[in-house]
A protein has these predicted regions:
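Short conserved active-site loop signatures built around small residues
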Residues: 1-25
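Short active-site oxyanion
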Residues: 66-68, 89-90, 115-116
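Conserved N-terminal alpha-helix of the aminotransferase class I/II PLP-enzyme fold
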Residues: 30-79, 83-84, 100-107
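Residues at alpha-helix termini
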Residues: 17, 61-62, 111
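PLP-dependent aminotransferase-class I/II
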Residues: 106-125
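General beta-strand structural signal in soluble alpha/beta enzymes
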Residues: 27, 69-71, 93-94, 118-120
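Histidine- and aromatic-rich ligand-binding microenvironments
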Residues: 14-16, 23-24, 29-36, 120-122
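Conserved PLP-anchoring active-site segment centered on the Schiff-base-forming lysine
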Residues: 83-101, 119-120
């Protein structure tokens, strides 16, 4: 499948409830469950919803990967990746980054033994 075709169609399936060709944007926060802990794939939008699920499948297909992951913010994505590291690991970062990222690196994650050298990325030396 060519890139443009993947970008438009990967992860997209007609909505069984409405017949919509493209995945609807689901703005609900919670989903009906058949019983406690017995959901139909979605229980709370913060964990997963059909819109984000389709986007993650689409990104995985575009990147020729098995899985894709989407987050509500860049800091949420950073938090997820950083938590896979171990004390003593170093993350080389640009010195020209979002202030929230700088603060979370230095005030939260540095306490766990992670090292964050900040580099001037405009100076290749």
């Amino acid at each position: 499948m060519k890139f443009a075709t993947k970008a438009i169609h990967a992860g997209v399936h007609p909505d069984p409830a409405t017949g919509a060709i493209m995945t609807p944007i689901y703005q609900t926060s919670t989903y009906v469950q058949d019983g406690v802990g017995n959901h139909k794939g979605y229980e709370y939008s913060r964990t997963l919803n059909p819109t984000r699920h389709a986007l993650e499948k689409n990104i995985a297909a575009i990147e020729n990967g098995k899985h894709g992951a989407c987050f509500g913010s860049g800091l949420a994505a950073i938090d997820c990746v950083i938590k896979m590291l171990n004390p003593g690991d170093e993350i080389i970062s640009t010195n020209d980054l979002y202030g929230g990222s700088y603060r979370i690196f230095n005030t939260i994650f540095a306490k766990y033994g992670l090292v964050f050298p900040f580099v001037d990325m405009q100076n290749p030396a």
